[in-house]
């Protein structure tokens, strides 16, 4: 049968191993990730600290599979950006135990620091080449 090898940055024992796993994911056959928000007209919004996820969505892997619950669907584009910044980012900062203002307040404070997780913003409206990005939308509340 087929052999699958995953690149799991969370299983890395050192910072160097973590960065290597993130780099290898850029040349993966398939990259799987979540989405921070989806606008009502179909734009995908993602925010990253390091940029490894948004880089892989933009370019690299042959196939990108993005999974989201219907709780990620918002109104217009500004609502999707607001959701990514004020819902997903603070929860993610808390998950990584970062000393950012949003970890305490639950809202984006536009912080600029070495610990910010809002370094890279990606707004995706179209996929080139066609069919490379597949979105799986699940009718339930998933993730943050």
In which residue ranges do the predicted regions lie?
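Glycine-rich oxoanion-binding loops at beta->alpha junctions
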Residues: 8-31
């Amino acid at each position: 049968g087929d052999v699958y090898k995953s690149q799991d940055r969370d299983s890395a024992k050192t910072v160097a191993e973590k960065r290597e796993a993130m780099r290898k994911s850029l040349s993966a056959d398939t990259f799987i990730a979540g989405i921070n928000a989806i606008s009502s007209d179909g734009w995908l919004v993602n925010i990253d600290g390091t940029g490894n996820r948004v880089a892989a969505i933009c370019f690299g892997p042959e196939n990108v599979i993005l999974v989201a619950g219907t709780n990620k669907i918002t109104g217009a584009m500004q609502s999707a950006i607001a959701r990514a910044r004020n819902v997903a980012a603070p929860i993610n900062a808390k998950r990584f135990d970062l000393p950012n203002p949003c970890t305490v307040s639950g809202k984006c404070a536009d912080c600029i620091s070495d610990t910010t997780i809002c370094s890279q913003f990606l707004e995706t409206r179209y996929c080139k080449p066609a069919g490379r990005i597949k979105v799986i939308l699940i009718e339930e509340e998933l993730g943050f």
